[in-house]
Amino acid sequence: MSSGDLVLKWAWPNPEDLRNAELTSTRESGEFETPPADTIFVTYFFRFNHHTGRFEEAGRLDWYPSSERAGSVYFGERQVQMNALHRKNKPTSRSRRFKSNKGNEYKWKKGSDAGMQELDFVCVDSWRRVVGRWSNESQTLTMTSGGFAIFDELVVTLWLQIWRREKGFW
């Protein structure tokens, strides 16, 4: 870890419902919030705005009512299908790929495939440079400077990896 890295500590107020999470660090903070309702299948993600002193909506996940796997993710106005943020390159692949807003490809790999613990994840760019590391033990995402440009995408795709792993369909 370098001094320029950003470390986000994740906390789940209710560990039984991973759709609600709080992220904190000394520089940035955010949260995922799913309103408790039977008919609404939306998870919002917020980022703290240091200029206004408030959390502001950065996007949302619209879940299909019959599925915990599929839906649409909105990064501001840009819509992406959830499955596009969790693509396998080939049927036997143990990593999951996604494209950033700028068209660059990234992939999340299981920690055991990157010399880390089984429940950890590491995200690399197309040049195999690490842009983020998830430590399940400490519940932290360490983002390198290479991940700052895709902050929202990195946080949301990690959240989806954790969600899918816990639901048994990573």
Write out the residue ranges for each language-model feature:
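Low-complexity or membrane-interfacial segments used for flexible interactions
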Residues: 1-32, 36-46, 92-96, 101-170
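A beta-rich soluble binding module of mature secreted/lumenal proteins
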Residues: 38-51, 55-60
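Helix-adjacent hinge/juxtasegments
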Residues: 56-92
